[in-house]
Amino acid sequence: MGQIFSRSASPIPRPPRGLAAHHWLNFLQAAYRLEPGPSSYDFHQLKKFLKIALETPARICPINYSLLASLLPKGYPGRVNEILHILIQTQAQIPSRPAPPPPSSPTHDPPDSDPQIPPPYVEPTAPQVLPVMHPHGAPPNHRPWQMKDLQAIKQEVSQAAPGSPQFMQTIRLAVQQFDPTAKDLQDLLQYLCSSLVASLHHQQLDSLISEAETRGITGYNPLAGPLRVQANNPQQQGLRREYQQLWLAAFAALPGSAKDPSWASILQGLEEPYHAFVERLNIALDNGLPEGTPKDPILRSLAYSNANKECQKLLQARGHTNSPLGDMLRACQTWTPKDKTKVLVVQPKKPPPNQPCFRCGKAGHWSRDCTQPRPPPGPCPLCQDPTHWKRDCPRLKPTIPEPEPEEDALLLDLPADIPHPKNLHRGGGLTSPPTLQQVLPNQDPASILPVIPLDPARRPVIKAQVDTQTSHPKTIEALLDTGADMTVLPIALFSSNTPLKNTSVLGAGGQTQDHFKLTSLPVLIRLPFRTTPIVLTSCLVDTKNNWAIIGRDALQQCQGVLYLPEAKRPPVILPIQAPAVLGLEHLPRPPQISQFPLNPERLQALQHLVRKALEAGHIEPYTGPGNNPVFPVKKANGTWRFIHDLRATNSLTIDLSSSSPGPPDLSSLPTTLAHLQTIDLRDAFFQIPLPKQFQPYFAFTVPQQCNYGPGTRYAWKVLPQGFKNSPTLFEMQLAHILQPIRQAFPQCTILQYMDDILLASPSHEDLLLLSEATMASLISHGLPVSENKTQQTPGTIKFLGQIISPNHLTYDAVPTVPIRSRWALPELQALLGEIQWVSKGTPTLRQPLHSLYCALQRHTDPRDQIYLNPSQVQSLVQLRQALSQNCRSRLVQTLPLLGAIMLTLTGTTTVVFQSKEQWPLVWLHAPLPHTSQCPWGQLLASAVLLLDKYTLQSYGLLCQTIHHNISTQTFNQFIQTSDHPSVPILLHHSHRFKNLGAQTGELWNTFLKTAAPLAPVKALMPVFTLSPVIINTAPCLFSDGSTSRAAYILWDKQILSQRSFPLPPPHKSAQRAELLGLLHGLSSARSWRCLNIFLDSKYLYHYLRTLALGTFQGRSSQAPFQALLPRLLSRKVVYLHHVRSHTNLPDPISRLNALTDALLITPVLQLSPAELHSFTHCGQTALTLQGATTTEASNILRSCHACRGGNPQHQMPRGHIRRGLLPNHIWQGDITHFKYKNTLYRLHVWVDTFSGAISATQKRKETSSEAISSLLQAIAHLGKPSYINTDNGPAYISQDFLNMCTSLAIRHTTHVPYNPTSSGLVERSNGILKTLLYKYFTDKPDLPMDNALSIALWTINHLNVLTNCHKTRWQLHHSPRLQPIPETRSLSNKQTHWYYFKLPGLNSRQWKGPQEALQEAAGAALIPVSASSAQWIPWRLLKRAACPRPVGGPADPKEKDLQHHG
């Protein structure tokens, strides 16, 4: 330790006396950054200067390096000036801390501490030090610790507690010198600190790393592992240094003081039970651990580190050194001291003392258990009242009103004191003025303190109220001075008995001894821009009564600095705050769209516009990434407009939901607000600042002419036009500015939409006051107002494209409708768009608009010419007449709102009006919904909801009465019989409904008083009447349909008419057939006025019921047929009944419905053997089972061109495989490839080895998930096997597949692929399957793969017959189970033979035996392999042997040594 890079070995220079160690560390790190490195002479001169500076009366804590630089004499030897310059540049990165709370009065002794209560926890003050600065010349590669290095570091920190300034100074220099990795730092922590400190440090470091990873670290890749792992790489210097800073910062947050707490020294006795030791630790932590500190990691760490040696060995042996506490207790519960028995020591609870409790004065309990609060230690130092603490003193809570600020006073309300340090990088909740960058051009705005703007016409003087605790509060004018370390107050504010001390002060006039005194009494200062008072523990007193200065000690509690704005700007201008959310917070890659070339005229205009924007401060030069093209557009008056194409940025931006529902309805402006004024903001978007991090998304390039040089890059500083979230952001900012004005003038109204503002007031005087306040607020926030566009009554008021008159509204521009039949599509589309804009004031129904909308449909080319029919031309005439009457009334607040809803075939028209008014308030049009049926009740309910929503949103009222054109009978029938969801809505609003009745023809003259030529609205009546009971005198009509045919039967005691007919092409559907059958039936029953209709189609049944209750025809594919139903059912009385089909009931309704269904049925003919073979390519035996003779089947096979070739599945020898003893005993699985039409299919095949039944599925991959899916489908098809046998492919040996087999209790084994002995069955099955697939695709090349595979499985499993048992695979798979043959049954008397044998599964070449077979069967023999067990041996491992002759007996010449194979 003590070694510095590029320097000889020398001890670390010691700090001068009186300077804190962490401040000295800052000076050392700044000195080590000098190039070349510092010398001993530099350190000597630095210590000499600091010693002189520490002796000055003005203390430098918190230290101010700028003040030190000002005290440095010119020509001072050494490089002290360079060191201070480095510190001044680095100090801006460290946030200052608030002043400590005022200490209690020293005149009173602290209360006696209670021995039963642990001392309170005091959190150490974190040292204020600069970040680790790696000096120049540091080695590029990291050097790991050596043991001598660790010993040297430990020797220097042996007398310092972890987190103390001396400890942090040594550790920081060690980190600076060795540049350690994360593992090196962990080794250093374990070597230096106890396990408790290491555990707490590890926990704090984890939380810091989590915050840093969330915030984002340069060079950190989340996919490469956690930060600890990446910081271990010596090549990752950036990440390593980030980890070093976090590791050092974790020491500053360690709980506890410099000494170890009392509970850290609790050790387990040599004979103490482990559970008693843990209990003592738990109680000590509960009493002494600071609040908020987690107890569990500390308890686990101490439970191991402070245990005795024997318990530590037990915990190490079981691996429970840092396990949960329960595991540690179980590991040590059986431990007892050597040569001693287990003793349970029970300590009795100590009785409470006889003395009374000092809190409540009562005896019988401990003071720590008392519920009363702790009494104050003595009289309050502020008011000398002994009944409360100083923190509860009423003098700290001002009761007198605060002084009113003057017009030019400060406007900011700084935050109050808080017990924890604030993060000043965010400005303490304040907003900086726009000229802050001009005042401090070299500072980063994120690191500047909040500012206090002052009046440039006056000195920085403010009014303050001072309370010296010895006299009444007084108001004085004080000078704000950031150069004064302490606040100075005149002696006139203090009483004569105030204790004052002599002091010397060094100021601008030199040093003085008797001018100022020092007082230690707390002083309360109330400032106009602060809601809570400032408490100063001491201040200077001017004995000559000349000065009142607010110094840095007071301003530091305000967390602000002074700022004097330029003389050009008003003194109280505050900018609009930058938006908190822009829609680009996810920071995608900025767009890089190349700038397209411009002609010389446009390029010159663009350069002129850019120069004007640069002078206005809207843009600035830029060199970063991102680009969007720009171009100028020439306006009608000859000037140019700057256009920035931000479509690429808009595509990356998240839409912000706007709180504005749209432009306000000006008809809601009451007639009582007759005095109006408009305010138009100029370049409103250019007043919202744009954060720096979003500039790449709004950058552009101005090219040079003919590409003579690189273009000039710029980026927006403010919110540009063309950004899709700009209107929403500006609306939110403007609404925030206008909200105080709205609250100050409740009798007036302010309408705001985008950058247009309308002021409405009941009197001219109120309008002037409202206008003045609004203008002042807008100007104070930097929003320029266009004076030439301001309008005021009396006079014409044009706002949002409308002209506001005293009692009505008109549109500024009403379109002119030319009457002609030929239109270009863009012309008609533009005309209808203009008509739609003024439709709220146009007295017309929906029909003329719908007629012209239909003319725009079915056109795909924008250049098409549209030819209108006579009815559409007539619609143009009606619209021109209606536009001539375009006018709307303004709201009369004394009259109720009325509504009229007219339902027509083309849509709904809703009118909101007031009685006795010449014009309505608004006309609303809505098209029919996109459904096949539009019930009148549903349309009425939707119109009512739309009407209520609009009137509440625009007028704040509901319509008192709603007129509609549905007849009363139809309306009541819909309410009583319909189950539509709109019925509850209509019932809820039924008290407001009123039927127009006979007044429909006179609607316009009776209610609206309009002269517009509008057609009368007819009352709506249903097409036919629905009878609730069956009609005895009417015939019965049955109809039905299928996808290909339709039929009906007309019956009246006998079948009068019946017919079945096919559907006409090209569209064929069951609904179309059912509708067509009903239409033919109605056509045949046209002569009857009454009719009973029986339908088994729910679609037609509900359609007819809705038609009977009243409906309009909507959009449907069956619209031409549905339009015929009203004509055929007109004025009929119909009984409608739904029939359930295929019930086979004996009643006549079911019988006639079944007879109708029979007319649709086409008989199904069985396939002939030749057709069956052409479809499936099944075998000869399958054809004979389907009725063909053997000769016919043979001829069919010979005539099939696909079956004449050889089958590839027979090319593999049959071999011998292990087969199952019953179905679903053993399966074999494999994946085979089948390529067709450039698509490679993976066929997952499973074969039952007993029956040969196959299950196959086609997949596109060979993954484990596909293999699992195919096995599950096979189990659903064939059943669950006991064993499965596959090859060792990756899909079958994966962990997922094995886990699935284990969960299903299936045993999985593997075999050698392409081996006739082990995998022959599944390989042959693959060949059979692919042969059939090739045949199918040869016959039908377009056959889907799923269909071909299904036909092949049907053919193999259900049609083809096995030659050995004359059954199909499916029959064999589902055949009855045979009784198992036990191996222990009595042996037969059949003659057995002697065999040599080899045991299965062994590779031995030596034959064993001979042994006499106990039993022989097909394929194996039961051989006694030992004295106590026998085993079935297959024939391939047996060799026939002669019977051994008895001892001494002759050999039998007939016996031969034979070898058998199965």
Curated annotation (Swiss-Prot):
A motif (PTAP/PSAP motif) lies at residues 124-127. Residues 93-144 are annotated as: Disordered. The keyword Metal-binding applies. This is Gag-Pro-Pol polyprotein. Residues 1219-1388 form the Integrase catalytic domain. GO terms for cellular component: viral nucleocapsid. Gag polyprotein: Late-budding domains (L domains) are short sequence motifs essential for viral particle release. They can occur individually or in close proximity within structural proteins. They interacts with sorting cellular proteins of the multivesicular body (MVB) pathway. Most of these proteins are class E vacuolar protein sorting factors belonging to ESCRT-I, ESCRT-II or ESCRT-III complexes. Matrix protein p19 contains two L domains: a PTAP/PSAP motif which interacts with the UEV domain of TSG101, and a PPXY motif which binds to the WW domains of the ubiquitin ligase NEDD4.
